[in-house]
């Protein structure tokens, strides 16, 4: 296999970096749930 010729350590770095933004998109998802609870207060 010629896949061993490629540096797996360098190709693996960009992979985890793309996962960081994926986690940052989750915080806003939780903030959207807060307003949902405030709607019950006025109720």
Curated annotation (Swiss-Prot):
Disulphide bridges, residue numbers: none
A molecular-function term among this protein's GO annotations: nutrient reservoir activity
Signal peptide region: none
Subcellular locations according to the entry: Vacuole, Aleurone grain
Ranges of compositional bias, category Low complexity: 10-23
One cellular component term from this protein's GO annotations in UniProt: vacuole
Top-level taxon: Eukaryota
Chain intervals for the UniProt region annotation (Disordered): 1-23
Assigned keywords, A-Z: Allergen, Repeat, Seed storage protein, Storage protein, Vacuole
Region (3 X 6 aa tandem repeats of P-F-V-Q-Q-Q): 21-40
Renumbered ranges of Sequence repeats: 21-26, 27-34, 35-40
Protein function: Seed storage protein. Serves as a source of nitrogen, carbon, and sulfur for the young developing seedling.
Family according to the record: Belongs to the gliadin/glutenin family.
Quaternary assembly: Monomer.
Protein name: Avenin-F
